[in-house]
Amino acid sequence: MRRSSSVQRVALLSVHTSPLAQPGTGDAGGMNVYVVELATQLARRGVEVEVFTRRTSSEQPPVVETADGVRVRHVAAGPYEGLAKDDLPGQLCAFTAGMLHAEARHAERHYDLVHSHYWLSGQVGWLTADRWDVPLVHSMHTMAKVKNAALAEGDAPEPAGRVIGEQQVVEAADRLVANTDAERRELIDLYGADPAKVVVVPPGVDLATFAPAPGRAASRARLGVPADAEVLLFVGRIQPLKAPDLLVRATAELLREQPWRRSRLRVVVLGGPSGSGTAHPDSLADLVRSLDLEDVVRMAPPVARAELADHYRAADVVAVPSHNESFGLVALEAQACATPVVAAAVGGLRTAVLDDGAGAGTGEGTGLLVPDHTPRSWAAALRTLLDDPARRTAMGARAARRAQGFGWGATAEATLEVYRRAVQDRAAERGADPR
């Protein structure tokens, strides 16, 4: 029996990182937030959502039902602990087998489509969608060719196997979801994606959690931050790509130029180690010591979302110095809390942040975009905003207003339309096929 173009059941794939994991630790980051929020919003719209992710602990139950009606299925594929992300390609066959086994208990074409996230999931999605004869929708989140073109110091290039794997997924997918027009262009120019298959759907922000507050006093009091402190905030995994070291070096440069600022300046780094190692946090702590900034820079582990919102609201400026971002959810969350952002002028950050320009600014921006990754340029940008509280306040107000257009509900609605068109096209391809 043929199914209509309506979308009733969706299989979301997040192989390498669980949507239930704490963002900012291990391999958990913005993609985790994306998958959780998308799944939740789809469920609220009557879509049955099942998320497949690799089991990483013997304590994880096979299936978890979230309060919002999303089913998260932990698939056994390789050892539970100690398996590096780079070794996961060797477990994709096992993961695929686990997915097929789970689906075998259902009627034919139980899922209307597969939506895979990141290239590892895309490899599994390619096979399972083909086996189930349903469309494959894929979100890259990051791309090897883009990352390799802008490698951070100390970061290893992505291997050829990933580049090939991404190319295969791009060619196999029925639809490719890009976060921004820039990402759409990269998919077309670097991977030869069919322009008709690439659809731009901006990510969202939880506007109920990340929202402005009247002043910063309450948030600072809850966090124990002095009312007169000047606070710079970094949120993200401690890895070369995210460049927290650049913020530390820029802080040292800033204090060399304005030593009087030291007693009030506080730089907060919220994030954990990337993957299963701790080398990067240790090296960042060593850098802080070598620059004699232990009284200025405070490193802390990731926090729950409500507390994270307090950190955004308590900050004067949020710094996002990444070497590349497909969008930059941290920048959007900060702006939703009415905090201006200083970000690198790369990737999706050029969409997430409206540059207020140099000098007195244009009066339209929500932050500053820095054109390079030198400590001097970053110190200058940070100093510009720290020296001008009125400009920060105006920027923050504009940022909060702009963030209202990025709710996750809008992301889900646009994604659902992508799903409907993919399902409709597949139904048309089947024609009179009675299966």
From Swiss-Prot:
1D-myo-inositol 3-phosphate binds at residues 16, 27-32, 85, 118, 142, 162. One of its GO terms (biological process) is mycothiol biosynthetic process. UDP-N-acetyl-alpha-D-glucosamine binds at residues 22-23, 30, 237, 242, 303, 325, 333. It holds the Pfam family Glycos_transf_1. Its EC number is 2.4.1.250. The keyword Cell membrane does not apply. Mg(2+) binds at residues 312-313, 315, 339. It is an enzyme of class 2 (transferase). InterPro entries: Glyco_trans_1, Glyco_trans_4-like_N, Mycothiol_biosynthesis_MshA. Homodimer. Catalyzes the transfer of a N-acetyl-glucosamine moiety to 1D-myo-inositol 3-phosphate to produce 1D-myo-inositol 2-acetamido-2-deoxy-glucopyranoside 3-phosphate in the mycothiol biosynthesis pathway. This is D-inositol 3-phosphate glycosyltransferase.
